[in-house]
């Protein structure tokens, strides 16, 4: 789950 982590940084 790489996209999930990336979205977490964006939020």
UniProtKB/Swiss-Prot annotation:
GO-annotated cellular components: extracellular region
Subcellular location field: Secreted, Cell wall
Major localization listed first in the record, in broad terms: secreted
Domain of life per record: Eukaryota
Keywords: Cell wall, Secreted
Record-given protein name: 14 kDa cell wall protein
Native source organism of the sequence: Nicotiana tabacum (Common tobacco)
């Amino acid at each position: 789950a790489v996209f999930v982590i990336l979205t977490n940084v964006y939020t």
